[in-house]
């Protein structure tokens, strides 16, 4: 089979490429450029991020060492349109967006995948820790969690278009991270011990404040208030805070620990409350993407952030929204984040959280 492989320059995609070669597939590597190289050279990179010049150099070296052709694909225009601009817009709306999910939907498993398939390839592969398997229950190929629970990346795939699943290969999904590194070492792949990407690729210094400043947006300090309107401190700009956050708030002496309850962009106010008030009994989410057919009401487990615990829930589908009711209250349901739905280890789909239900 002819397979186009997304080669980031990291160990995961390198091993995915290696495994597909071992299986006898005809393989070509493709590397995305989301930002110009100069951007990374001007930034203080505090955490490892993807798509940097060093990643491009590593991707080229990996491909050459494995005897595979590599093509660099410029996705900067679509990346700005579909990821950076919506991210900026959502921050100013008071949301906490997840740019990686949007990148997967519109860029990596959208524009980039379309480009690869247009070159005559039968399948598109990446180094994601997830699996694609045929489901007898649903009568089609589905995305399942990777066997390494700590590294499972299915959450980030919750909103890709369902028709694409038939064309996907995730060779790493049946391995743990430790096994992937061991395979890389045994194969002599030079990035076997390379640090993992940990931050948003277009914010390499980890500062949303600096990102917005670079985009021409200056944040204003505002009041931190309780539900009763009592001023308890000040914030540096509401886009810098998220529901459930406690650190970073300039709160004057108060009788209890306070957490971000909500943000009100119109008045540049951050509302705080006690811990009890940042647990939610449910949520409303919009623009759902379903990988399988689902009934109007069904039970499943829901994940509201990548690292959140899975919460058993009842989901009711209504037009372009879903209402989710949890069996037990869930911490920090955050507008702008993704609610991903699972039937055991099968990913059913995902929707954008509109509001939490207390």
Swiss-Prot record:
Chain intervals for the UniProt region annotation (Interaction with tRNA): 151-153
Q: Does the keyword NAD apply?
A: no
The record's keywords, sorted A to Z, are: ATP-binding, Cytoplasm, Disulfide bond, Nucleotide-binding, RNA-binding, Transferase, tRNA processing, tRNA-binding
Q: Name the residues that bind ATP.
A: 6-13, 32, 127
Question: In the UniProt record, what gene is named as encoding this protein?
Answer: mnmA
Which family is this sequence assigned to? Belongs to the MnmA/TRMU family.
What Gene3D superfamilies does UniProt report for this protein, alphabetically? Answer: Adenine nucleotide alpha hydrolases-like domains (2.30.30.280), HUPs (3.40.50.620), Translation factors (2.40.30.10)
The UniProt entry lists the main location of this chain as: cytoplasm
The record's annotation in NCBIfam families points to: PRK00143.1 (NF001138), trmU (TIGR00420)
Which positions form S-S bridges? 103-201
Q: Which reaction does this chain catalyze? A: S-sulfanyl-L-cysteinyl-[protein] + uridine(34) in tRNA + AH2 + ATP = 2-thiouridine(34) in tRNA + L-cysteinyl-[protein] + A + AMP + diphosphate + H(+)
Q: Which organism is it from?
A: Thermotoga sp. (strain RQ2)
Give the UniProt subcellular location, in the record's own words.
Answer: Cytoplasm
Residues the record annotates as the site (Interaction with tRNA) are 128, 337
Q: What is this protein called?
A: tRNA-specific 2-thiouridylase MnmA
């Amino acid at each position: 089979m002819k397979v186009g492989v997304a080669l980031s320059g990291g160990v995961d995609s390198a091993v995915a490429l290696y495994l597909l070669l071992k299986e006898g597939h005809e393989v070509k590597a493709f590397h995305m450029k989301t930002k110009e190289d100069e951007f990374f050279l001007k930034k203080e990179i505090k955490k490892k991020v993807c798509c940097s010049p060093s990643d491009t150099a590593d991707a080229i070296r990996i491909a050459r060492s494995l005897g595979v052709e590599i093509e660099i694909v410029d996705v900067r225009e679509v990346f700005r349109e579909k990821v950076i601009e919506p991210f900026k817009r959502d921050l100013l709306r008071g949301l906490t967006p997840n740019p990686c999910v949007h990148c997967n939907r519109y860029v990596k498993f959208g524009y980039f995948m379309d480009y690869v398939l247009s070159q005559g390839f039968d399948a598109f592969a990446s180094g994601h820790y997830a699996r694609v398997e045929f489901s007898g229950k649903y009568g089609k190929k589905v995305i399942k969690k990777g066997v390494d629970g700590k590294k499972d990346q299915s959450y980030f795939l919750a909103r890709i278009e369902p028709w694409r699943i038939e064309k996907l290969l995730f060779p790493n999904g049946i391995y743990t991270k430790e096994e992937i590194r061991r395979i890389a070492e045994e194969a002599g792949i030079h990035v076997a011990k390379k640090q993992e990407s940990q931050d948003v690729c277009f914010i390499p210094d980890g500062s949303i404040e600096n990102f917005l400043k670079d985009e021409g947006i200056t944040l204003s300090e505002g009041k931190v208030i309780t539900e009763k309107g009592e001023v308890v401190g000040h914030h540096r700009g509401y886009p810098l805070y998220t529901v459930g956050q406690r650190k970073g708030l300039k709160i004057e002496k108060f009788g209890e620990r306070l957490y971000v309850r909500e943000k009100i962009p119109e008045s540049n106010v951050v509302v705080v409350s006690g811990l009890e008030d940042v647990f939610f009994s449910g949520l409303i989410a919009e623009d759902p993407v379903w990988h399988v057919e689902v009934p109007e009401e069904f039970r499943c487990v829901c994940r509201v952030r990548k690292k959140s615990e899975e919460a058993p829930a009842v989901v009711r589908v209504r037009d372009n929204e879903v209402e989710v009711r949890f069996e037990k209250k869930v911490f920090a349901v955050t507008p702008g984040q993704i609610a991903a739905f699972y039937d055991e280890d099968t990913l059913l789909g995902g929707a954008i959280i509109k509001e939490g239900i207390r």
